[in-house]
Design a protein with these regions (language model features):
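Short Fe-S-cluster ligation motifs
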Residues: 76-86, 105-136
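A boundary/linker detector
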Residues: 1-32, 37, 51-52, 116-153
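Short Cys/His-centered divalent metal-binding micro-motifs
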Residues: 51-54, 79-109
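Conserved aromatic-histidine-acidic binding/catalytic patches
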Residues: 21, 71, 92
Length: 153
């Protein structure tokens, strides 16, 4: 039986929305940040409590300003490695928030933190899908480089 190619149609993939692309890019960025912060053996430290674990073993990309601030969702300087305990539960406590603030001031300076605070008050940016896709592609390339550096590729 010959297949009639003229009438045969492939199921088309649904195009992703901008918010879906932003979420995928954010996941990739968090992975990249953990890899970048890890040593050559793949271990990184939580910026708030100091526990050291493998980059993919109960470590997450913690946000200084929460992801609800879309300005910072794809902002690399706002994301750092945190253990799951600090990221999920600890950020609700003043002690962990203060530890993260001290880390940020040591890393970037008080002036930069104030500038980020002013940015957090702005309206959410309108991401263009092609820009987000390109950003994600670049991050995925950086992830490959980091995986190669720690010997996991």
């Amino acid at each position: 039986v010959l297949l009639n190619l003229w009438n045969f149609t492939m199921a088309k993939r649904k195009k992703r929305t901008v918010s879906q692309e932003v979420d995928e890019a954010a996941k990739a960025l968090q992975k990249y940040v953990r890899l970048k912060a890890s040593d050559d053996n793949g271990y990184c430290s939580c910026v708030t409590c100091g526990v050291t674990r493998k980059w993919n073993d109960d470590m997450q990309g913690g946000h200084f300003y929460g992801r609800r601030h879309l300005v910072f969702k794809l902002f690399e300087e706002n994301i750092h490695p945190q253990c799951a305990g600090c990221n999920l539960y600890g950020m609700k406590t003043t002690r962990i928030q203060e530890a993260y603030r001290i880390y940020m001031e040591d890393m970037y300076g008080a002036r930069r933190i104030k500038a980020m605070q002013r940015l957090s008050w702005r309206a959410s940016p309108k991401f263009k899908i092609k820009d987000v896709i390109e950003f994600r592609r670049k991050i995925l390339e950086k992830i490959k480089d980091e995986l190669w550096r720690i010997g996991e590729m």
